[in-house]
C-alpha cells in the first residue's frame, strides 16, 4: 500500500503520466498479478508438506473462485490460462507450475516443508483482504 502511494505521488508530478493498477491493461501481454506467498509455522517445520496440502485442499473448498473481487477488480481479464495465468473458472495446484491457482515451489517439494504461492490475486488487489481470505479459508 505504501509503495502504491509513493508511485502515485511521483507520477502526479509528471504531466500526462498515469498509473493503471488494472491486472490486464493490454490484451496481448501478460497481466499483472500480485502472487501471494503463504505459510504457517507448521508448514515450515519438518514434515510440513502435509500441512501445505491440507491448507490447499481447504482453500479449494472455501475460496476457489478467482473472480472474487477480493483478488482485484477485473482480475477475470488476467485469469484466462493464457500468458501463464491461472484459470478463474477452476482451482488447481502443482509443483513448479505457472498456470495453476496455487504453486508449490520445487524447493518446498524437495524439502517437504516451506510455503505455497497463491497466483490468483491481481495487481490491484487489497493485500489485507487477500491475507484475510487465506487465513479464514485455511486456519479455521
Where are these regions (language model features)?
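Active-site capping/gating regions of soluble enzymes
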Residues: 1-140
Amino acid at each position: 500500500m505504501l509503495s502504491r502511494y509513493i508511485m502515485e505521488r511521483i507520477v502526479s508530478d509528471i504531466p500526462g503520466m498515469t498509473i493503471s493498477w488494472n491486472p490486464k491493461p493490454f490484451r496481448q501481454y501478460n497481466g499483472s498479478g500480485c502472487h501471494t506467498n503463504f505459510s504457517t509455522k507448521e508448514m515450515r517445520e519438518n514434515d510440513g508438506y502435509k500441512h501445505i496440502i491440507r491448507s490447499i485442499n481447504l482453500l479449494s473448498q472455501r475460496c476457489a473462485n478467482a473472480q472474487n473481487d477480493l483478488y482485484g477488480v477485473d482480475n477475470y481479464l488476467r485469469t484466462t490460462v493464457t500468458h501463464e495465468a491461472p484459470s478463474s473458472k477452476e482451482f488447481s495446484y502443482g509443483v513448479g507450475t505457472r498456470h495453476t491457482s496455487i504453486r508449490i515451489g520445487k524447493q518446498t517439494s524437495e524439502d517437504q516443508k516451506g510455503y505455497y504461492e497463491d497466483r490468483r490475486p491481481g495487481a490491484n488487489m487489497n493485500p489485507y483482504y487477500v491475507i484475510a481470505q487465506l487465513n479464514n479459508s485455511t486456519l479455521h
